[in-house]
């Protein structure tokens, strides 16, 4: 019995250690209008942490689809932050989603009361 459990554990470890299948060549982001393909992953991470949302907040099942209005709003917000950050001469990102949203879907319009 002990050997059977050990064998099953080894098989489970070997199974989970396998690489995930790689996406086919050309399977990168589609329908990009504001971001470059190399910026997408970082920008999505910034949005999810800055607004406290998940991918499905803006994206339909077909990630390239524009069917959800929130995706169009997100595009405008990404463009706005790019324009603001372009005004800083050091080239660094000074403004992010979190700057206004503070981890919530709707930005606070006033400081919280103490």
Which residues make up each language-model segment?
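Post-cleavage N-terminal segment of exported redox proteins
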Residues: 2-38, 50-56, 62-72, 80-83
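Short, flexible, mixed-charge glycine/proline-rich loop motifs
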Residues: 39-51, 86-92
